[in-house]
């Protein structure tokens, strides 16, 4: 049935999440006929049920979240490497990846990006490949061979015409880049480049070869490989190595849908809220990939705690656990002696307000009914 | 090099800078002081984009997998 405007307004004004309001509206629309009286009753029931489903005050949500993620975590494969499809890009998954996420490591062990392209590039394999070549870091080894001439004491680079054409770079550009990077004279003649070290010694010569090999001639530093995969009807690029800021500015890249698995990088480039979303997505994906189902609310809580200071901080000694107010709670976690020693030197006081410290001293914890305190007034005060 | 708005990225929810009056109302509603709110750095890309200053409060409209949309507040710190 069609809902009267007054009812819609009534639903909008309820103190319910948007998803519930939508469900309520669509449920009512599907119903054959609802009277005013029934409508009021439905609303009353929904609001009551919602209030009932809410987490109660003093509920230890953190402990519940820890257990809800920890228990499935025990069933995760200890060491898993996954190859993303045929494209043999190695990505850390399973328990090591989950640990990496909650530890807020600066650089993940296998940084990788998922680059989505603008519509006109995403549908055409050749254009997608051109973007891939533009992004992939090109070194001299991609373009030709490098050899040392010990008689002349110089380095001879033979460039391959086809390889250069493919990567859209000319011999002049290569010579220019090498000149800038090494600060040495570069003798370029057609596809042959000759360079000599400052001092004519074997050591210098070999070092120069190593330096030349490391120069990034084209593309983004740190992106070692780019592979193209077709997903649905669009081509998507996957990379080994990550450099979000630079890749977002490339021609053909869709900056609104391109991601990396490096959470700190997301925090720097897209902000703390994006980092929070990235933590949720990465953690859920890691668990889901292992066939484990964890309610997203627990992961959201972890992500909220990790990002509440404006930086991504780890769950651990240098982050959430290390910032606890209670000395005993910190000591119970890691490096016990240091915490107790420091507290003794500073003369810290433990208020015994948390869970851990009360368990340690053998008192009831201040949670649930344990959090309610009774304050008695003397009878003469009450009478007066 | 083209620039894009950080807020257009699919990972970034909508950030709204609150006026001092609105900020005061939020604090009253939750019965907290500004320093009790979660923080956001003034150097945060989104905070810079909307021109927030230290001490401002930013309202964030998150897309939530459970509630579809949820409101969050952050205090801008340096």
From Swiss-Prot, chain B:
**What family is it from?**
Belongs to the archaeal Rpo5/eukaryotic RPB5 RNA polymerase subunit family.
Q: Does the keyword Ubl conjugation apply?
A: no
Disulphide bonds annotated for this chain are: none
> What PANTHER family is this protein classified in?
DNA-DIRECTED RNA POLYMERASES I, II, AND III SUBUNIT RPABC1
The family database entries (HAMAP family) matched by this protein are listed as:
RNApol_Rpo5_RPB5
Assembly and partners? Part of the RNA polymerase complex.
Known function: DNA-dependent RNA polymerase (RNAP) catalyzes the transcription of DNA into RNA using the four ribonucleoside triphosphates as substrates.
Instruction: Give the GO biological process terms.
Output: transcription by RNA polymerase II; transcription elongation by RNA polymerase I; tRNA transcription by RNA polymerase III
What is the name listed in the Swiss-Prot or TrEMBL entry for this protein? Answer: DNA-directed RNA polymerase subunit Rpo5
Q: Which species is listed as the source? A: Methanothrix thermoacetophila (strain DSM 6194 / JCM 14653 / NBRC 101360 / PT) (Methanosaeta thermophila)
Q: Which domain of life is it from?
A: Archaea
Q: Catalyses which reaction?
A: RNA(n) + a ribonucleoside 5'-triphosphate = RNA(n+1) + diphosphate
A single Gene Ontology MF term assigned here is: DNA-directed RNA polymerase activity
């Amino acid at each position: 049935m069609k809902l009267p405007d007054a009812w819609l307004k009534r639903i909008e004004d309820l103190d319910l999440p948007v998803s519930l309001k939508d469900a309520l509206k669509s449920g009512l629309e599907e119903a054959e006929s609802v009277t005013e009286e029934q409508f009021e009753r439905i609303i009353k029931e929904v609001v009551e049920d919602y209030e009932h489903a809410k987490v109660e005050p003093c509920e230890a949500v953190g402990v519940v979240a820890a257990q809800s993620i920890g228990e499935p975590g025990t069933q995760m494969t200890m060491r898993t490497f996954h190859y993303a499809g045929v494209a043999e890009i190695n990505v850390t998954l399973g328990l090591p990846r989950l640990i990496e996420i909650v530890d807020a490591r600066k650089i993940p062990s296998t940084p990788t990006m998922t680059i989505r392209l603008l519509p006109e590039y995403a549908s055409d394999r050749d254009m997608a490949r051109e973007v891939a070549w533009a992004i992939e870091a090109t070194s001299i080894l991609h373009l030709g061979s490098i050899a040392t001439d010990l008689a002349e004491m110089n380095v001879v680079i033979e460039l391959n015409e086809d390889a250069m054409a493919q990567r859209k770079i000319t011999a002049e550009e290569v010579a220019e880049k090498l000149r800038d990077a090494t600060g040495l004279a570069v003798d370029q003649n057609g596809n042959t480049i000759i360079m000599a070290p400052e001092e004519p010694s074997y050591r210098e010569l070999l070092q120069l070869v190593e330096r030349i090999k490391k120069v990034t001639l084209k593309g983004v530093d740190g992106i070692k490989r780019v592979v193209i995969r077709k997903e649905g009807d669009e081509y998507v690029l996957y990379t080994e190595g990550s450099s979000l800021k630079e890749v977002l500015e490339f021609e053909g890249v869709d900056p609104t849908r391109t991601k990396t698995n490096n959470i700190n990088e997301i925090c720097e480039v897209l902000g703390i809220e994006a980092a929070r979303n990235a933590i949720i997505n990465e953690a859920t994906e890691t668990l889901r990939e292992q066939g484990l189902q964890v309610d997203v609310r627990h992961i959201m809580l972890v992500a909220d705690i990790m990002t509440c200071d404006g930086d991504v901080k780890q769950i651990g000694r240098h982050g959430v656990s290390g910032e606890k107010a209670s000395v005993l709670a910190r000591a119970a976690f890691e490096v016990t002696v240091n915490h107790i020693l420091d507290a003794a030197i500073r003369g810290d006081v433990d208020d015994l307000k948390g869970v851990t410290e009360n368990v340690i001293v053998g008192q009831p914890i201040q949670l649930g009914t344990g959090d309610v305190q009774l304050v008695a007034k003397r009878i003469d005060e009450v009478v007066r | 090099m083209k620039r894009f708005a950080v807020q257009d990225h699919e990972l970034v929810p909508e950030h709204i800078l609150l006026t001092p009056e609105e900020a005061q109302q939020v604090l009253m509603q939750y019965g907290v002081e500004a320093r009790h709110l979660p923080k956001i750095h003034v150097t945060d890309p989104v905070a810079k984009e909307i021109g927030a200053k230290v001490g401002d409060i930013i309202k964030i409209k998150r897309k939530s997998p459970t509630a579809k949309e949820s409101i969050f507040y952050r205090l801008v710190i340096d």
